[in-house]
UniProtKB/Swiss-Prot annotation:
Gene3D superfamilies (alphabetical): Hypothetical protein
The organism of origin for this protein: Vibrio cholerae serotype O1 (strain ATCC 39315 / El Tor Inaba N16961)
The ASCH domain, residue ranges: 8-93
Domain of life: Bacteria
Protein name: N(4)-acetylcytidine amidohydrolase
InterPro entries xref list: AC4CH, ASCH_domain, PUA-like_sf
Sample GO molecular function, one term: N4-acetylcytidine amidohydrolase activity
Keyword field: Hydrolase
Function recorded in the entry: Catalyzes the hydrolysis of N(4)-acetylcytidine (ac4C).
């Protein structure tokens, strides 16, 4: 397993990442290979435009049913919308990971 040095976000989320307002992302196992203490480059998913850099703070397992208001607040989206988005991106996947990060200074 190699250490990931880049991460992509939907373009509509990148202003929240770049402002430091969005501090977590929920991904499946295939996108969970980030290492706390490393810096990664943030790109838009749609256009591969570099947005900023973030420092990975933690990578922790998370079951779909455990997604709650805290995660929604950190993701800057309402809980029902967050759950719907996660199900759309990762259909029928219960084993997820929450990646906590901060904007690189």
């Amino acid at each position: 397993m190699s250490i990931s040095t880049q991460i992509t976000f939907f373009e509509f989320l990148t202003p929240l990442v770049a402002s430091g307002q969005k501090t977590i992302t929920i991904r499946d196992k295939s996108e969970s290979h980030y290492v706390p203490g490393t810096r990664v480059e943030v790109f838009t998913l749609e256009t591969q435009r570099k947005v900023c850099e973030i420092d990975i703070l933690a990578v922790e397992p998370l079951k779909f049913d455990e997604i709650n208001e805290f995660h929604a607040e950190q993701e800057a989206i309402e809980l029902p919308k967050l759950k719907a988005l996660i199900q759309e991106i990762y259909p029928n996947i219960d084993e997820l990971y929450v990646i906590t990060y901060q904007l690189a200074k």
